[in-house]
Amino acid sequence: MAAPWTGALLLLLASQAVSSAQALDEEEVPEGWVLLHVVQGQVGAGNYSYLRLNHEGKIVLRMRSLRGDADLYVSDSTLHPSFDEYELQSATCGADAVSIPAHFRRPVGIGVYGHRSHLESAFEMKVYYDATLEPHPFGETAYSDGTDASRKHAYAPEDASQEEESVLWTILISILKLVLEILF
């Protein structure tokens, strides 16, 4: 009796994983973001690949592991950040994202770490310039060039429900991997 339910559960989890993978390919980007670069690379287990960022302004890095598990470390004080020395980091088992503030000194060092649990990790990193305007602390939008405040774009942080959905997908995919690993 358990075999039909196991098959149905595996089918359900597999379909969720496929729809999750399709959603990653079609990730939503806020209106004020401009894609600057797409970088693909590989990094061995326990090693780092280093990149250098020279673009000014607020930059957003979005990285996803194509294979294995790659983590992201960022620093404006060293060009070789690591898990011991960094200012910003994202070390998740899924998509990694870091917002680099405009005040960071350039060049900014970016370290991509290949987690030891995988022999090799492949990653794709998208580099965005964030041109959205943040509200001024006193209610007025801060414009460096003095343009009309009526033309401002509201700054909206990512929707919390979207973040919760992402965590749910990560958990479901992890469960699917575990079940498949146990069965095969």
Swiss-Prot record:
It is found in: Secreted. The keyword Transport does not apply. Residues 1-23 form the signal peptide. Glycans are attached at N47. Keywords: Apoptosis, Glycoprotein, Secreted, Signal. The keyword Signal applies. Pfam families: UPF0669. Its main location: secreted. It comes from the Eukaryota. GO terms for cellular component: extracellular region. Disulfide bonds: none annotated. One of its GO terms (biological process) is apoptotic process. May be involved in induction of apoptosis in CD4(+) T-cells, but not CD8(+) T-cells or hepatocytes. Belongs to the UPF0669 family. This is UPF0669 protein C6orf120 homolog. It comes from Bos taurus (Bovine).
